[in-house]
Amino acid sequence: MAGVTHSFDIGNVSVGRGQLFLIAGPCVIESETHARTLADAIQRVASDVGIPYLFKASYDKANRTSIRSFRGPGLVEGARILRAIAQGTGLPVLTDVHTPEDCLRLSKALGDVEVVLQIPAFLCRQTDLLIAAAHTGRAINVKKGQFVAPLDMQHAVLKVRDSAATLSTQSRRASS
């Protein structure tokens, strides 16, 4: 696995070819207006500096510390908002998935929208989730858990690749 580079395009963003790109947006979708305002503002800045941009927002933040915390609008409304943003801005979108069932439901709800399914850090070792995401045929970003040694992330990536996905990447972060 070391030294092997796979590249692909998601919308106007090239991944794996050494080109810097930006993933940015609100942690969670609070409203369509708020998400669209942020998408437009970030898109202007990214365009001004010549950096390709993916809009990131989650329809559900399932790992909140408190059960009373706002989690988002849910999959159906969240997918509608992500679709509206993608269609209104031309941006590809990235959003978290938390269960194997959500992978297929979200993929169907977004239809032809350019989307990256992101596996949250806390779930980066969950085999069933990685396989389900791979089976959608969508691009996948596996976020590295802080509890995972950098070299151990190859196992998550291989689970995705061995399950039919050719469009995968990983986000790195600090290790404990």
Can you say where each PLM-predicted feature lies in the sequence?
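N-terminal amphipathic alpha-helix/helix-capping segment at the start of soluble metabolic enzymes
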Residues: 1-22
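Short amphipathic alpha-helices and their capping/turn segments at secondary-structure boundaries
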Residues: 8-11, 35-50, 154, 158
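Acidic (Asp/Glu)-rich catalytic clusters
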Residues: 13-17, 43-50, 86-88, 107-112, ...
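Structural preference for beta-strand elements that scaffold enzyme active sites
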Residues: 19-23, 52-56, 92-94, 114-116, ...
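Short histidine/acidic/glycine/proline-rich micro-motifs that form metal-
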Residues: 28-29, 176
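Glycine-rich anion/phosphate-binding loops
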Residues: 29-44, 73-80
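N-terminal active-site wall of soluble small-molecule enzyme domains
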Residues: 57-118, 126-129
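Conserved anion-binding
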Residues: 62-65, 112-115, 119-176
